[in-house]
Swiss-Prot record:
Annotated keywords: Chaperone, Cytoplasm, Ribosome biogenesis, rRNA processing
Cited NCBIfam families: 16S_RimM (TIGR02273)
A biological process term (GO) from this entry: rRNA processing
Coiled coil: none
Subcellular location: Cytoplasm
Domain PRC barrel: 148-229
Keyword Chaperone: yes
Description of its domains: The PRC barrel domain binds ribosomal protein uS19.
GO cellular component: cytoplasm; ribosome
Record's protein name: Ribosome maturation factor RimM
Stretches the record annotates as Disordered: 1-21
UniProt organism field: Burkholderia pseudomallei (strain 1106a)
Protein family per UniProt: Belongs to the RimM family.
Length: 229
């Protein structure tokens, strides 16, 4: 999920999706062959499809869909808010426990407020049920392209935050969607009342009136914000 820029400035605007908020995943029953580990004969991974360095978790398989190997997914962001990555990417990496598999998706589409898809090699309902609980990753490079001055949250997490005077304010630890716009949760080293080190926190709205530049190459966000706010 992500938010919207409610200011007039175009710079600093975030699209309506980005980093993904994990949703609860239904746990498969402990017994039953169809609910066990991912079927290694159905979904395979080979050296040419090793786990990508830019893998981002975008959803999870929650159930089978129909009888022909389709699966139902909970996207960590809804369609148009991150679920688009599930719809666009055709190469998926699945992780269930310690086991990782690659799947070439033949079809993916919206179904109500969920995404349903057909991973290649998933031939029937039992095969699909075996995938239940698997976390779904795609390459960051397979995310849909964004317009200029739009950013995925996943690309903002970890950036340094400085103000226009060059004062370091901390590092983006998380992004929050308050329903109106996005908020950067910025962490910085601080000292508690007992004199012990602790982690301080700043909440800075990710809107154009405060965010003056997002310099991804430099690894920083420049804001109109004072250290004592």
């Amino acid at each position: 999920m992500a938010g919207h820029d409610s200011g007039n400035a175009k710079r600093g605007r975030s699209p309506s999706f980005g980093v993904f908020v994990r949703k609860p995943v239904e746990r498969a029953p402990a017994k039953g062959a169809s609910d066990g580990a991912v079927d290694s004969q159905a979904i395979r991974i080979d050296a040419a499809q090793s786990w990508p360095d830019d893998a981002v978790e975008v959803g999870a398989v929650v159930d089978a869909y129909g009888l022909k190997g389709w699966v139902k997914l909970a996207a960590h962001a809804g369609a148009g808010r991150g679920g688009d990555a599930l719809l666009k990417a055709r190469d998926w990496w699945l992780q269930k426990g310690a086991e990782r598999k690659f799947a070439r998706v033949t079809q993916a589409k919206l179904h109500g407020d969920t995404v349903v898809a057909h991973p290649g090699g998933s031939v029937d309902r039992d095969t699909a049920l075996a995938l239940r609980g698997a976390r779904v990753f795609v390459r960051r490079g397979d995310f849909p392209a964004l317009a200029a001055d739009e950013f995925y949250w996943v690309d903002l997490i970890g950036l340094d935050v400085v103000n226009e005077a060059g004062v370091a304010l901390g590092k983006i630890a998380d992004m929050i969607d308050n329903g109106v716009h996005s908020i950067m949760r910025v962490e910085y080293p601080a000292t508690g009342k007992d004199g012990r080190p602790k982690t301080g926190e700043r909440l800075i709205p990710f809107v154009g009136v405060y965010v003056k530049a997002v310099e991804q190459a430099a690894g920083r966000v420049v804001v109109d914000w004072e250290a004592d706010y």
